[in-house]
Design a protein with these regions (language model features):
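Conserved active-site alpha-helix within GNAT-family acetyltransferase domains
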Residues: 1-20, 126-143
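Long, charge-dense
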Residues: 22-25
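Conserved N-terminal entry element of GNAT/NAT acetyltransferase domains
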Residues: 27-43
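Intrinsically disordered, low-complexity, positively biased terminal segments
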Residues: 39-166
């Protein structure tokens, strides 16, 4: 929900408010996160990425992940030699998952170009450590959104960045 009337309408239809989301935009952060490295994701990473998504969300997003790997936008973050997170792309329209905030910071810091794709990247505002890190590294808040669901919802058990699409 991005508008007060939408929020009220969806709430009256039975949707549950789950999370305030901050759209962040600006020059991509170029910071090295100790102990983390990032590389382009490959087909051989799918099983590890799906396991991380299941650990954080209770389900995987295999279809989006496979499509992103084919498009060349997916990346994985490694702590040592172990995959500890991934992104389908650092845009408004792609999700990211990590076991820790440092995993997401490394992924966010791997962006290239002049800005993050679309209106920006989506950061759960209640993840104050990650939200403040983005602000302290020059990103600006451009839009406030509300994540709402109807039906089954698993409270995330790790670090994540949602997609506007799913």
């Amino acid at each position: 929900s991005y508008h007060n009337r939408s929020l009220a309408l969806y709430a009256s239809l039975g949707f549950e408010v789950r999370e305030p989301i901050s759209t962040m935009q600006g020059k991509p952060i170029q910071e090295t996160i100790p102990g983390r490295s990032v590389r382009t994701a490959t087909e051989s990473d799918i099983e590890s990425c799906n396991a991380i998504c299941k650990a954080v969300h209770g389900h995987d997003r295999n279809g989006e992940l496979r499509d992103s790997i084919k498009q060349g936008s997916a990346k994985v973050v490694l702590h040592g030699y172990k995959i500890t997170g991934y992104t389908c792309g650092l845009t408004y329209f792609n999700h990211s998952v990590g076991l820790t905030n440092d995993d997401l910071k490394a992924l966010i810091s791997s962006a290239t170009g002049d800005y993050y794709g679309g209106p920006g990247i989506l950061i759960p505002t209640r993840n104050t450590q990650l939200f403040r890190w983005c602000l302290n590294n020059g990103l600006r808040l451009v839009q406030q959104l509300i994540l709402m669901t109807i039906g089954l919802y698993n409270e995330p058990a790790g670090s994540y960045m949602p997609s506007i699409l799913y």
